[in-house]
Regions:
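Terminal output helix/cap of sensory domains in signal transduction proteins
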Residues: 117-118, 242
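Intrinsically disordered, low-complexity terminal regulatory regions
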Residues: 1-108, 118-128, 141, 150-222, ...
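PAS/PAS-like sensory domain cap-loop motif
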Residues: 89-92, 96, 233-241
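Short, glycine-/Ser/Thr-/acidic-enriched flexible segments
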Residues: 134, 223-224, 232
Length: 242
């Protein structure tokens, strides 16, 4: 990690802790998971049905091929930090934390302190929260990595995260969750616009066009860019959709 990246990383943690202090949280606070009523949870899942199906299509093959022997759990949460689904090893943590990894659990910082899911939402980018970087002591046995999933309108549609209580290579874990979230974002764009629009694929080398890290521009019949993924903005150094 380069010096400026480390400085930014430390700032993310410090800013989150300051928010927790402002909300009146204490390090010894042990919150109960906040869950929506069953009818409300059903409505939330219905609203995010496409996100759920797309994420499952991307995550399950990757988990089976790469992570099936790892002690980790993959969570999909909505834009308000409510868990929509999970995949992986449910034995990753002690019994008292298991309710937090179940559908409907809400990870908002205001209730459960610094954590990968809602801190990622707060900063609008990927984060990794190591054990003692969690504001609440109750969460310090786990490591979380998370990255937001953006829709075609630059809004956060959800958050993909990986939690573990084992010493996995953390740089690899954060890179993996970023890759998966980008894959989901790309597939959401493809589903939304489909064959009725023109798609331009960008990358730094010609042999990487099929990579999830490719930039995607979607154009209408007049050639106007109407949608793009985050990677396209990074490659072009500009907001491609105004």
């Amino acid at each position: 990690m380069r010096k400026n990246e480390y400085s930014d990383y430390r700032s993310v943690i410090a800013d989150s802790w300051n928010r927790c202090i402002a909300w009146g949280l204490d390090h010894d606070h042990e919150p109960a998971p906040l869950r929506p009523e069953p009818a409300r949870l059903e409505e939330i899942n219905r609203q995010h049905s496409e996100l759920l199906s797309v994420t499952e299509a991307e995550v399950l093959p990757y988990y089976r091929n790469v992570l099936s022997n790892s002690r980790c759990l993959i969570l999909l949460a909505d834009q308000h930090a409510t868990v929509l689904s999970s995949w992986g090893d449910e034995r990753i943590t002690e019994t008292r934390l298991k309710p937090w990894f179940q559908t409907g659990a809400n990870w908002q910082e205001q209730n459960c302190g610094t954590n990968a899911i809602d801190t990622s939402i707060a900063v609008g980018g990927p984060v990794q929260i190591q054990r003692n970087e969690h504001f609440l002591k109750t969460n310090r046995s786990i490591i979380g990595s998370a990255a937001p999933i953006f829709d075609a309108h630059r809004q956060i549609a959800g958050v993909l995260s990986v939690f573990s209580d084992a010493y996995l290579p953390q740089a690899h874990t954060l890179g993996m969750v970023r890759l998966l979230s980008q894959s989901v974002e790309n597939r959401l764009i493809n589903r939304q616009f489909g064959p009725d629009h023109f798609q331009i694929t960008l990358n730094t080398t010609a042999d990487n066009f099929d990579s999830p890290w490719s930039g995607i521009l979607v154009c209408d019949d007049s050639g106007q860019v109407i949608a793009s993924n985050q990677r396209a903005d990074q490659l072009l150094g500009m907001n491609t959709v105004e």
